[in-house]
């Protein structure tokens, strides 16, 4: 696999999620954390939004981070000027490329949109800026027109082109083909930006990488517009564990990072969320728990410590004797097989009644109720 660069946009697209507002202090904390764990590039915001946004971007720019920082801009000269005022050395310029987007934003005048793009790239380059261009709604654009825009952007001085599945309508197979077309035609790197409207943001990001894209947009916990974006933790771990490529990210801190962003955004991370959900390494099923106790590889794709978790055995409706005895032995309680079965029966009954698994305290109380205190050592 080609070398892949993570360009995380939690501070831009992530904050565009409905109902999410980061304070300046939260933005600084998130930027520092992303930089600390080794994320090489951050899209830090939209200077044209106004003074408050500019203050946050300036604060991040003044941190002296190792990561490269970009500001997001429309194809408007005043946007570029605002980015320069924030101390940005890199800018991303977005331009609509689909018929539906050009009709809505430029009244169908695609020549006007291209001239705007050319003028903005020229202005940015004259300012000494590194320029990336993004084709907004690339996934629904005419492929020939999209390719023309990308080639023009390259000719006019862009150093990277972003393929955007803006409304998340692609599958991995189509993504591969569309990105491959750009990669084959351009000499500048291609970046993929995917959305999760059909639950395929991470899969589409990986497909774009397989097609030759050398940069990928992510957000922590998949935070973003509508159904969100490709999740940083999912992309990083998939590349590391499925493709065998270590991107230099400090993965044991991914859980801590996700908790920081979840708290700042007010987002509730589902327990079943890949990589960072609290049930990712929790086992209740008797067959699974027994297997994991014998060899964790039986039911885990990688060690929980690799992303900051610890393995957790849960007792409930689906538990078996091995889970119960293992948890009790951790608390110095050793039961014979008949006693263990009796406790297990009680666990299952209580779990059904409560419609959830039992806490450790509830399990220990069941043992007391069964009057097996003699088993404690």
Curated annotation (Swiss-Prot):
The gene is nifV1. It is an enzyme of class 2 (transferase). Gene3D superfamilies: 1.10.238.260, Aldolase class I. Keywords: Nitrogen fixation, Transferase. NCBIfam families: nifV_homocitr. This protein is a Fe-Mo-cofactor biosynthetic component. InterPro entries: AIPM/Hcit_synth_CS (IPR002034), Aldolase_TIM (IPR013785), LeuA/HCS_post-cat (IPR054691), NifV/FrbC (IPR013477), PYR_CT (IPR000891). SUPFAM superfamilies: Aldolase. Belongs to the alpha-IPM synthase/homocitrate synthase family. This is Homocitrate synthase 1. GO terms for biological process: biosynthetic process; carboxylic acid metabolic process; nitrogen fixation. Residues 4-255 form the Pyruvate carboxyltransferase domain. One of its GO terms (molecular function) is homocitrate synthase activity. Pfam families: HCS_D2 (PF22617), HMGL-like (PF00682). It comes from the Bacteria. Its EC number is 2.3.3.14. It catalyses: acetyl-CoA + 2-oxoglutarate + H2O = (2R)-homocitrate + CoA + H(+).
